[in-house]
Amino acid sequence: MDWYSTLIGGLIGFISSIGTLIVERLLNQKGKINLYAKIVYEHQYGKNTWGFWNFEDEIALNVPIWIEFQNLSNSTRVMRNVNLLLYKDGNRQQELCQINRSGDREKKFDFANDGSYSFVIEPRSIQKYECHFSLKRSMRKAECFDEIKLRYFDEKDKEHILHLGSVNGSWEVGDFPRSGEWIKLKK
């Protein structure tokens, strides 16, 4: 009978330790990822902000942007394939091109995470990246757009789409209005 109570006690201890590990893991994953964005001037010359520019005898949409990730959880988070999407009347039109680097060999600058638009965000941390997105007029799929959204995939490959700004996407050279402030991106 003594060995029976020892076995039951050991089994209860084993099950409770597994339960504690499961609860602890769930609590560590609690917490949100917040994304903030700041529209800035392009890196190389510092004179153009987001909008339509003349580029190599063609109009191009350019979005130089700082993106800040705030991981408020106790676990490492993954933000994969961060990109900007164009919308018209709530319908997705197309995605922009992620610019990996600018400059020449002597003055090379890598955007995002050394040219990659996927990020590993450490627990309870804030990380800022300088990114640049672009789309030439000849590559567009729609005549115009009225909204730009940011999209990423998390560590479970779930798609997240957040509103960046409402704009007049008529493909006429000029800058979009910008506040110069950090904005919290929301659905």
Language model regions located:
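Membrane-aqueous junction of the first/signal-anchor transmembrane helix
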Residues: 1-187
